[in-house]
Amino acid sequence: MFVSILIPLYNGVEFLKEAITSIRNQTYQQWEVIIGINGHPKNSDTYFQAKLYENHKIRIIEYDTKGKPKTLNKMVEDASYDIICLLDVDDKWLSTKLEKQISLKSKYDVIGTACQYFGTRNDIPKIPLGEVDTRYIFRVNPIINSSCMINKKDSFWNDEFIEDYDMWFRLVFEKKTFYNVPEVLTLHRIHPASHFNNSNHNFLPNLINKWKKKFGV
């Protein structure tokens, strides 16, 4: 099974080498990478640096979409394969990440991994490990974004709310199955400009209320 790995790129090109290196070091090598450049012209330093990595397995595509969710949805359309992984440009994977997820793909629709922060923090976020009891989705976002492996047909990010959490709610509603490999295989960088510090958590109550109404709880 081949995997399409999506790296949306707006800021953080200085971290791209580490992300790409962590993909190249995977024990599972049946993959392609799409680096989706958004908001940078062809004469920009970001575009030039990304082009340095282009080869038969790594594609560079420009998008004129506004915002990460719309860019990701376009990247999914351009993906060659039926399995999608997401890697934020400032994050990276341990070498057996894809191999261990692929071994579970026939059993589960959404597969994540345990994660560790690095950079300005080094703790391990608390998420459900092993087979995820999706009843707990109202308490915690069950999948770390950069750890996810998901079917292409299920991949759609909504820019109205917190994009990944909203998608997990939708897939739980559709009775999809979730699993987190109980091993730290994803490293999530925390730094002043990271999504961790800048995501709009004010949307969270509205998101929870939206899905409580749909679930009838």
Protein language model regions, located:
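Short aromatic/hydrophobic "clamp" motif used to bind/position activated sugar donors
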Residues: 84
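Conserved donor NDP-sugar-binding/catalytic core segment of glycosyltransferases
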Residues: 98-124
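Acidic donor-binding segment of Leloir-type glycosyltransferases
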Residues: 20-62
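Conserved nucleotide-sugar donor-binding catalytic segment
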Residues: 132-203
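A conserved hydrophobic helix/loop-capping motif in glycosyltransferases and polysaccharide synthases
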Residues: 3-15, 19, 26, 36
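Cell-envelope/extracellular polymer assembly enzymes that use nucleotide-activated donors
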Residues: 2-4, 22, 32, 166
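Glycine-rich, basic loop-to-helix element that forms the pyrophosphate-binding segment
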Residues: 46, 63-79
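The conserved acidic donor/metal-binding loop of glycosyltransferases
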Residues: 88-92
